[in-house]
Amino acid sequence: MSFSPSFDALVQALTCLSGVGKKTAQRMALDLLLKKNAEAATLAKALTTALATVQRCRYCRNLSDAEVCLLCADPLRNRQQICVVETPADVIAIEQATDYRGLFFVLMGHIAPLDGMGPEALGMDILDDRLANEAISELVLATNATLEGETTAYFLAELAAKHGIQATRLAYGVPLGSELSYIDKQTLHHAFQSRDHYHEL
């Protein structure tokens, strides 16, 4: 039963968000309309502004308000390193959790031939040009630990080798606080393959 077509339209629009089903969308819509009218207006304005302003950086393809993003424009970044990730969310995660201070390149996906996602769709031509014309010494492969991510990492490693650039892959390991008996076989296998000299945390 529908009591407001506008409310229904808002609920339907909210379900486009990742992980948001109809029930959650209904709660969000009610919260916005009944409790937080001013905040809802601020949200609507911020979304409208972001849709009109945010674009992809011409160098790294990350989200940016300008032609060149803040990370690429930062003179303090290590310009000899490029970390290749699948999404802007990966950039945020690395920036928040590590001391990496090189540059990034965002693929906006991974190689998936069945979905029509080949190297060209991921901006590999832009990356190839950068590797050819910039003084890059290391390409950090930070794609996901999935079949598609590994396929993409392999392609990237070949691209780096073509330009005589070192390619490094993020190590896989056992998460802190976990028990070995609960770790999947692939993670445990990679953890053994990537083992290093012991040092205190």
Curated annotation (Swiss-Prot):
Disulfide bonds: none annotated. InterPro entries: DNA_Rcmb_RecR, Rcmb_RecR, Rcmb_RecR_Znf, TOPRIM_dom, TOPRIM_RecR. A zinc finger (C4-type) spans 57-72. It holds the Pfam family Toprim_4. Keywords: DNA damage, DNA recombination, DNA repair, Metal-binding, Zinc, Zinc-finger. The keyword Zinc-finger applies. GO terms for biological process: DNA recombination; DNA repair. One of its GO terms (molecular function) is zinc ion binding. The keyword Protein biosynthesis does not apply. Residues 80-175 form the Toprim domain. It comes from the Bacteria. May play a role in DNA repair. It seems to be involved in an RecBC-independent recombinational process of DNA repair. It may act with RecF and RecO. Belongs to the RecR family. This is Recombination protein RecR. It comes from Dichelobacter nodosus (strain VCS1703A). The gene is recR.
